[in-house]
Design a protein with these regions (language model features):
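A contiguous strand-loop segment
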Residues: 15, 25-29
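Surface-exposed strand-loop-strand hairpins of Gram-negative outer-membrane beta-barrel proteins
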Residues: 1-19
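Outer-membrane beta-barrel porins/channels
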Residues: 23, 31-420
Length: 420
């Protein structure tokens, strides 16, 4: 396994560390007669920020085949009579300085109005302005290998120097009209230049921004002990534009626009008052992911490139349940859980963007600390599934490989409700 050439382990773990100590949100509503006007600002989507101090598997996989590539190139030059022996035999180790930091965040400013049609039925209409802010910064530097089984050396420098020496010799043989030796050293120079280019340092520093508007409609029905709410958010057409400062990877050309739609969302919630102090609720969310335009991905079987939405079998489904208990006049406690089920296929998943199904569990409490002021606190954690993706041609290396995606998430929240 190529990864064993760096640290001795065929399987490697790439851990992205993320920390968001403070994510603010603000919500306000003003009621007058049958009307209520509301607004809020919050981080409404995105995967947050993550730093991979050892890079990503898709990056290192290309470096891991360097020892084998050198041995194979040496064998080819021996077969062609360019080299008398394979001077690269014994190359079986490599090292690399790899790093990646990324962020994906969607900020939303929502405004809307609610009208009470009857004593039991209210309707809502609103819009949300979404601003997407993505960023990617990373590098692959100082690729080294134990060429010929010797000490670790910088591969780019080694072959750059090797190419210069071979080119000098080729030019000298050409001047002497020794075409046989010229052809030999010309081939060596070209091959060495190729390897030097493949092992050169790579840098990336790119931001992506874009915006779009989401229309929102909702209905709320309340009678006796029942309360039912339905909301539909329309699909948001949105592109993000690359603002690239450095990119010699060829992946993020400056000025290129990439589809980044926010999928339509249908939510349904039902609550029931079991006792005057005890309420239970259930909910369902469905994201229409297959109708949203997304960035391209390649089908490894057909080689065809198309939007990632074509690799989604079905939209995301979420199932929720919770219960709230009024412990006394000034305190409440609650608990709930959520099951999130994605319908993505292998071609959707990559180590730069992946989705794994999960269970979330949460607990909360509310305290009336003043006549018009309530303090809310909550804690929840998410237990993610593991998604395994097996590839016959891992990272374009020609070698079979496997990725296992998962993550962890823990959140503490605090909020204040003020009535005036």
């Amino acid at each position: 396994a190529p990864f064993a050439g760096f640290g001795g382990n065929a399987t490697k773990v790439y851990k992205g560390e993320a920390s968001a100590p403070f994510i603010p949100s603000v919500f306000a509503v003003y009621k007058k007669d049958k009307w209520a006007f509301s607004g809020n600002f919050a981080v409404t989507g995105g995967g947050g920020k993550a730093t991979f101090n050892e890079g990503l598997g898709s990056f290192e996989s290309l470096v891991s085949v360097v020892p084998g590539m050198l041995v194979a190139a040496g064998n080819e030059m021996v077969d062609k009579g360019v080299l008398p022996i394979n001077i690269f035999n014994g190359t079986n180790k490599y090292s690399v300085d790899s790093y990646m930091r990324g962020k994906q965040m969607i900020f939303g400013l929502q405004l809307g109005a609610t009208y009470r049609i009857t004593d039991y039925l209210s309707a809502f209409a609103g819009v949300r302005m979404n601003y997407v802010s993505n960023g990617y910064e990373g590098h692959i530097r100082n690729i080294e290998a134990n060429i010929g089984g010797g000490e670790m050396v910088n591969v780019n420098k080694y072959f750059s120097d090797y190419a210069k020496q071979a080119r000098t010799a080729a030019d000298a043989y050409l001047a002497a009209n020794d075409l046989a030796n010229y052809a030999k050293y010309d081939a060596i120079a070209k091959e060495a230049t190729k390897v030097a280019g493949l092992t050169a340092d790579k840098e990336l520093d790119c931001d992506q921004t874009g915006w779009g508007v989401t229309p929102i409609l909702g209905l709320d029905f309340k009678m006796n002990k029942w309360n039912i709410g339905v909301k539909y958010e329309f699909n948001t057409k949105l592109n993000v534009e690359n603002k690239t400062r450095i990119d010699n990877t060829g992946l993020f050309a400056n000025g290129v626009n990439t589809p980044h739609d926010i999928p339509a969302l249908l939510t349904v919630g039902v609550s029931y008052e079991i006792l005057p102090v005890l309420r239970a609720s259930v909910g369902y969310h469905h994201f229409f992911d297959t109708n949203a335009r997304m960035a391209d991905a390649k089908d490894p079987v057909t080689g065809q490139t198309m939007g990632k939405q074509h690799f989604i079998k079905q939209g995301t489904n979420e199932y929720l349940g919770g219960i709230e208990w009024d412990v006394c006049k000034w305190a409440q406690v609650s608990a709930g859980m959520q099951r999130t089920k994605y319908g993505v296929g292998d071609n959707y998943q990559s180590d730069m963007s992946f989705a794994v199904s999960s269970y979330s569990y949460g607990f909360g409490a509310g305290f009336d600390i003043a006549k018009n002021l309530k303090l809310n606190v909550a804690y929840f954690w998410t237990d993610y599934d593991k998604y395994t993706k097996e590839t016959p041609n891992y990272g374009g290396t020609g070698i079979a490989g496997k990725d296992v995606f998962t993550r962890t998430n823990k959140v503490f929240g605090i909020g204040l409700d003020y009535k005036f």
